[in-house]
């Protein structure tokens, strides 16, 4: 699985967090890749939807000063009766508004990086990976497999440095990119969102491909931890618990 040379070299991330304790064993450095095909109704990272960079707007921080209105070449920002209106359809993501917003209401989300740049940042935490161990890099998103070529290059760079690798995934992808990263991934954190029949309502996608990919990992004896964002009244159903019990008995 080779892919375009440009896509192999560059990727889009929207965050890199140090000293993470909930994204796999030990102390982790978590890299968040942009782009996700799911639209989970409880999503707390909507800025990760698009693979390209985006402009986020936090209304609660806006003072209505109008600085963004003055610099936006597309007139995507307007002040109407003292309130800020952001027309996303007109926005070309030039970022001019974020540079003049002194209240932090407008921010540019996402940056283009190489695998080497990411690993250079990850290596700064190497001392913390050794004790208590086995810490390392966790690649999250978004959906990391939405950038398959960059993901593989990033995992390979980590393995070349002897760094433990962990991939957090929804499992929604073709089988080929998943199979390509299996030899490079020490641990899969596989997120299941709810019972199979409820997937279209909960996430906007069907569950068949997701469970087929989970089956691939289980059959190949990969190290898999199934994780669930348990939300009362939404996905805490007896049917879902029954499906999970069957899967856990296989591990």
Residue ranges and their predicted role:
Residues 116-251:
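Conserved AdoMet/S-adenosylmethionine-binding subsite of the radical SAM
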Residues 40, 62, 68, 72, ...:
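Hydrophobic packing within well-folded, soluble alpha/beta domains
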Residues 16, 34, 46, 88-89, ...:
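Fold-independent oxyanion-binding glycine-rich loops
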Residues 12-14, 80, 168-172:
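Short gly/ser/thr-rich secondary-structure transition/capping motifs
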């Amino acid at each position: 699985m080779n892919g375009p040379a440009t896509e192999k070299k560059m990727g889009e991330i929207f965050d890199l967090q140090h000293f993470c304790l909930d994204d796999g064993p030990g102390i982790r450095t978590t890299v968040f890749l942009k782009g996700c095909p799911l639209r989970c109704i409880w999503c707390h990272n909507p800025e990760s939807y698009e693979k390209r960079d985006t402009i986020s707007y936090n209304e609660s921080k806006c003072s209505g000063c109008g600085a963004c209105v003055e610099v936006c070449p597309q007139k995507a920002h307007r002040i109407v009766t003292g309130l800020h209106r952001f027309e996303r359809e007109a926005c070309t993501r030039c970022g001019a508004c974020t540079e003049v917003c002194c209240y932090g209401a407008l921010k540019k989300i996402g940056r283009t990086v190489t695998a080497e740049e990411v690993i250079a940042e990850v290596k700064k935490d190497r001392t913390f990976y050794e004790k208590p161990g086995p810490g390392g890099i966790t690649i999250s998103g978004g959906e990391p497999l939405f950038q398959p070529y960059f993901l593989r290059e990033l995992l390979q760079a980590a393995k070349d440095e002897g760094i433990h690798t962990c991939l957090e995934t929804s499992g929604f992808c073709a089988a080929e990119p998943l199979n390509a990263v299996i030899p490079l991934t020490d641990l899969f954190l596989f997120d299941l969102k709810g019972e199979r029949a409820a997937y279209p309502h909960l996430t906007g996608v069907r569950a068949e491909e997701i469970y087929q990919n989970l089956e691939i990992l289980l059959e190949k004896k990969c190290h898999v931890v199934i994780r669930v964002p348990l939300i009362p009244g939404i996905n805490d159903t007896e049917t879902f618990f029954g499906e999970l019990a069957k899967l856990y008995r296989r591990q």
